[in-house]
From Swiss-Prot:
Entry keyword Transport: yes
A biological-process GO annotation: ATP synthesis coupled electron transport
Annotated organism of origin: Mycobacterium sp. (strain JLS)
Subunit text: NDH-1 is composed of 14 different subunits. Subunits NuoA, H, J, K, L, M, N constitute the membrane sector of the complex.
Any Gene Ontology CC annotation: plasma membrane
Segments crossing the lipid bilayer: 9-29, 40-60, 76-96, 105-125, 128-148, 162-182, 201-221, 234-254, 265-285, 294-316, 327-347, 365-385, 402-422, 448-468
Record key words, sorted: Cell membrane, Membrane, NAD, Quinone, Translocase, Transmembrane, Transmembrane helix, Transport
Name of the molecule in the record: NADH-quinone oxidoreductase subunit N
Entry's localization field: Cell membrane
Catalytic activity, EC: 7.1.1.-
GO molecular function, one term: NADH:ubiquinone reductase (non-electrogenic) activity
Protein's job: NDH-1 shuttles electrons from NADH, via FMN and iron-sulfur (Fe-S) centers, to quinones in the respiratory chain. The immediate electron acceptor for the enzyme in this species is believed to be a menaquinone. Couples the redox reaction to proton translocation (for every two electrons transferred, four hydrogen ions are translocated across the cytoplasmic membrane), and thus conserves the redox energy in a proton gradient.
Catalytic activity: a quinone + NADH + 5 H(+)(in) = a quinol + NAD(+) + 4 H(+)(out)
């Protein structure tokens, strides 16, 4: 039997470990006393360490296929696994106290790991049906996570996420149905051989449907409307997760799909348009925000635009995939650092309330500066390397105008991040609010750690680049 025709389930050990840990967390929550549910967190953290370990071991070996060629285990899958599991560990450290105070602690761990499993399935999918399964496995737990805060804003955000997810899920399935109807195949290698002979208009309709669905998961235009509301209304756990982890699977999945699309279809132009609109709209909308989390919600929309740039030149530049993977890793730790600062200061829900932070909490202010300037793309942070290499990939792939748009939008984004940074270094208010001055210590520590990781990834970019190439 051809290796690609074998099931080889052990190649998906990371995904099975993630999903199995979610099941254990869900069941344990029904039997453990409320005071003992911290064991679920220990088990979940151990599972993430296992996922990272398996991913590293499999990345050392050659690229392989599992489940009769439906799932690819390669460098992109390995990076997605490591970024996803490491992101979960940081998120749990940020929101550990919040989760322990919740009556749904075990269920929260379960929902996060179920959604993360869907993200990993998306990242390795080489089959349209597996892509659909990964989409819904990643999306459905998100709706519950957003609504866990039990507030009017969270309920509204959860409803928006559900409605948008259902709509774009339908578009995804419609696109998959069209592509299957045209080719009689769902595996990417078969699609690559048959799509070129299919009617271009029908192929375009199918591709647009699939792209729209993946844009919901990534949080980019045209499926971005729910992201700022969810980032603002959800609790710290859900807000940090939904603006970070789902992007990993969705964008790697989109990259894989574009590699099998026919050259006769102008799909790079479509993705380039989505990239420009996402980064521009996200930056312009973020400029007027006063709530830090809502600002970060719009910021994450703009980041999707930058991440779409290397996908635009997939197959046209050798820099495309490495730049995408490096950017995803750098964005993960940098975005978590920014949200960790907001979680450390839960009483400060507008930008002016951060006034004087550098004098009262200098380490937290330093983490905020590194995170926000990192999201801008300031050296020597990891996102700086990501943006430079994505722009270089666009230039190398003959999309020089797109590289120019990246640099212009990067400059524009600096202004609204400075609206947050400048008050932090101003004079503190004479009459301080006790709620505003209270600091959650674990999120503060994670903010400093994640900011340091962002700097470290930028400093050792050379060796890391070799690993993702």
């Amino acid at each position: 039997m051809n290796p690609e025709e074998a099931m080889r389930p052990l190649l998906m050990a990371s995904e099975m470990m993630m999903f199995g840990a979610g099941l254990v967390a869900l069941i344990a929550g029904s039997f453990l006393r409320r005071q003992r549910q911290w064991w679920v967190g220990v088990m979940a953290a151990a599972a993430q360490v296992g996922v990272i370990g398996v991913a590293v071991v499999q990345m050392v070996g050659p690229d392989q296929m599992a489940f009769e060629g439906a799932f690819s285990v390669d460098t992109a899958t390995g990076v997605a696994r490591i970024a996803c599991a490491a992101g979960l560990l940081l998120i749990w450290a940020v929101a550990g106290a919040e989760m322990r105070a919740s009556p749904r602690e075990a269920e929260t761990y379960a929902l996060l790991m179920f959604s993360a499993t869907g993200v990993l399935v998306l990242a390795g999918a080489e089959d349209l049906l597996l892509l659909v399964a990964g989409y819904f496995l990643a999306s459905i737990p998100l709706y519950g996570l957003v609504g866990l805060a039990r507030s009017a804003a969270a309920a509204e955000a959860a409803m928006k996420a559900y409605l948008m997810g259902a709509l774009f899920g339908i578009l995804l399935m419609l696109g998959v149905t069209i592509l299957y109807g045209l080719t009689g195949a769902t595996r990417y290698p078969q699609l690559a051989m048959t799509l070129s002979g299919a009617p271009a208009v029908a192929v375009a309709a199918g591709v647009v449907g699939v792209l729209a669905g993946l844009m919901f998961e990534a949080g980019g235009v045209p499926a971005h409307f729910w992201v700022p509301d969810a980032a603002q209304g959800a609790n710290a756990t859900a807000a940090t997760f939904l603006t970070t982890v789902p992007k990993i699977g969705a964008l790697v999945a989109l990259y894989r799909l574009t590699t099998v699309l026919p050259d006769t279809l102008a799909w790079p132009v479509l993705i380039a348009v989505f990239a420009v609109i996402s980064m521009t709209l996200g930056n312009l909308a973020a400029y007027w925000q006063q709530d830090p989390r809502r600002l970060l919600g719009w910021s994450t929309v703009s980041q999707v635009g930058y991440l779409l740039v290397p996908i635009t030149v997939a197959g046209a530049s050798e820099l495309a995939l490495p730049s995408l993977l490096f950017y995803l890793g750098g964005y993960t730790v940098t975005n978590i650092a920014a949200f960790a600062v907001t979680a450390a200061l839960p009483g400060r829900r507008d930008l002016d309330s951060y006034r004087g932070l550098a004098r009262t909490r200098p380490w937290l202010a330093a983490a905020l500066v590194v995170a926000l300037l990192g999201l801008v793309g300031t050296p020597p942070t990891a996102v700086f390397i990501g943006k430079v290499t994505t722009a270089a990939a666009a230039w190398d792939g003959r999309y020089a105008w797109l590289a120019v748009v990246v640099f212009v939008n990067t400059l524009v984004s600096l202004f609204y991040y400075l609206r947050w940074i400048i008050p932090a270094f101003g004079r503190p208010h004479e009459t301080g609010d006790a709620d505003q001055s209270a600091v959650q210590h674990w999120p503060a520590r994670v903010a400093v750690l994640a900011a340091a990781l962002s700097l470290l990834l930028g400093i050792i970019a050379g060796p890391v680049w070799q690993l993702v190439t």
